[in-house]
Amino acid sequence: METADMVKVAVSAAPYSIDKPYSYLVPESLAAAAVPGVRVMVPFGRGNKESEGLILTRVQEPKLPGSKAIRQILDPEPVLDKAGIDLALWMRGRYFCTVFEAVKTILPAGLWYGLREIWSLAMEPETARSAAVGIPGAWQVLDLLEKQGGKADIRVLRDALGDGAEKPLKAMKKAEILTCETDAKRKIADKSHRMVELAVNTEDAYALTEPKRRSAPARYEVVNFLATAGRTPAAEVSYYTGASSRTLKTMEKAGLIAFSEEEELRVPSLDDVEPGPEIVLNEEQQRAFEEILGRVQAAKPSVTLLHGVTGSGKTQVYLRLVQETLALGKTAMVLVPEIVLTPQMMRKFSSYFGSRVAMLHSSLKMTERYDQWKRIRRGEVDVVLGTRSALFAPLKNLGLIIMDEEQEGSYQSENVPRYDAREVAKYLCVREKAALVFGSATPTVETAWAAEQGNYQKALLRRRYNENALPEVLIADLRQEILNGNPGLISTPLRQELEKNLAAGEQSILFLNRRGSSRMLLCGECGYVPQCPRCSTAMTYHSANGRLMCHYCGHSEPAADTCPECGGWMKHVGAGTQKVEEELRELFPEAGILRVDADTTAGGHEEILQTFERERVPILLGTQMVAKGLDFENVTLVGVLSADISLYVDNYRAAERTFSLLTQVVGRAGRGGKTGRAVIQTYTPGNDVIRCAARQDYDAFYESEIRMRRLRRYPPFADLFTVTVSGTEEGRVLRAAVSVRETLRQLCRRPELAAGEPEVLGPAPAPVVKVNNRFRYRCTLVGKNDKATREMLAWLQKDFAKDSANRGMNLFVDHNAAD
């Protein structure tokens, strides 16, 4: 059989159920440009609709009857190299996504194409009308096309004609009255400005313009200016010489000057940053730095947990590691969990590395992200700093990845592909023979376990950098506050501490923990929270049916009005930051108060925090974004308004997250030369997690938590795969989820899976059962994250999509989901 020059293409239109590399012929006219990593337009499916794709590889294959050819090359050069393509293929196998979904995650949004379907007349209008006789609705389409000049975007046709456009369009295309083409347009174009320079040497330019200096003074002024300034933007030449654009064009025609285009990069600006002082490490920091640097120098893959108490100076260690990594001729990535932390960290790193640092996160303008990507790709950047998406920056010769606050759930994507940045970072370090550093005061239980087992290295920072003691912590019992006649949001101990700070001119941070607040029941007298008898997680209250439900195993029971432990009244817990702010203003009418929460814009976060630091505003109130990473030397008091809310949510990580959050927020106090204090308000003052956090005792928390995880087969002792079914009809979704559970149980009996002792739980409603008018039910598979399990789940997802009984419903798989 005859072989042909072909390419394997990842096609954007292919859903996960049929996703694979598709073979396409390479026309001779496109042969030179059809290389791996460029995007193409290809016909796809029975209707040969044009779709975007990415060339994965070029091969010689048998030319089969009906083979299709690529139609258009979209990129002048590859947007992904082999390493990027390999990463996309790895993500497909790991995170149950298509190759093209992985590609879109890796590339900046500014590189994406928008596809437009353009319908055009294939003949003269009158001829078209004659040919369209007998086609219902054809004349309305033809009238509209004539008004649009003979062609129109499908969206224009649908807006005008509604659903009635589809049938006549298809019929007229079949009759060759109309043609349909797909136009691809980049979402963001490169920006450039027009430059001007002399096209002849200076002496000749003066010789040509000096004689006409009186009659054409502008020409002489242009020559005089360019002779001094050299190549200059055309707008500046006009501004300084008064020459019009017409004058410049005349000079170009005369051969005096030449125009050219120069790229203009749109880079996010920072205020002027002063050079940073010399970094001096203490003995503990120096030891940790030398240990990790040795692994960077060894050029072998490694993972190190840098476990340091809050305020121990992990950032100084990061800076020194990056300095030495760059001295070795390598590059570095530094990841932070929250966008709000990026500008503060960026200023620190810019003070040492200047313009060789690039910042990447989702709140940058699309144009800025795209231009930062270009700088990185060209090798103009040595250090990339940003949130989890910064992992996909095309850095060459990577030597170091630092993941600060590695315990944060924001390192796990909630959108397809549902990737875990920690896993992607480990993949990159293996590929690049680089060192990975997980930095945290409260590492995840899985990370601490891996270090304990010797799978990761470990470096410890047990003391604060400034030698200050950790903050003194007072636990305020909210049950007693109610009994004492104070039902408000600010307890008496916290109010008294705030008064002390106001009198001393020191600052305070108040943290409101809002996660899960609207779904929690709690006894206001004894602190009892209803828990699932099987899963040891708090149950979620559903107001629609007045029941409590476990979102792991599906256990359900009526929600009681009174506490089964003490007979007290059960109450819904949760208040917003605005309500807290109102109470604060009543208590302290003269005090300045700033509020930062999810309603604050991304740029507003930074502005508020800078105002808090610069103007020493007495009180900062906020949610998650004030809990970590912030470093203000005049903050001596931290108040946690409700410690219980994140502790009693239906997630196996609830205790870990609460301990981490409390430890982090308490650690914001006393970071300058003054002693810090903290007040933790709670309905359950005897809870071990809250007591451990108050003592900043990670070891005690870890020992307790690891015992519970082992008993319940939670990570790291097993993996949890969440299989979610969604659709618009709740009954159908629930029946499909029951069917999925039975299929899973049958599949898990296979020998290659049974060895991992898999267990299938559910179905149960998702924590938020209805989103965008779609109901969601899920099963949980407890087992091993190995190749056999992933292949089985991939098959299940594809089989579900192919079954016509499941039309209108979706199934997706998540691994150790954050929620």
What is each stretch, according to the model?
Residues 353, 588, 747-753, 803-804:
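Short helix-capping segments at alpha-helix termini
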Residues 178, 257, 357, 475, ...:
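Generic structural signal for residues in well-ordered beta-strands
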Residues 39, 60, 756-787:
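Short, intrinsically disordered low-complexity segments
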Residues 593-594, 747-766, 807-815:
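Short beta-strand elements
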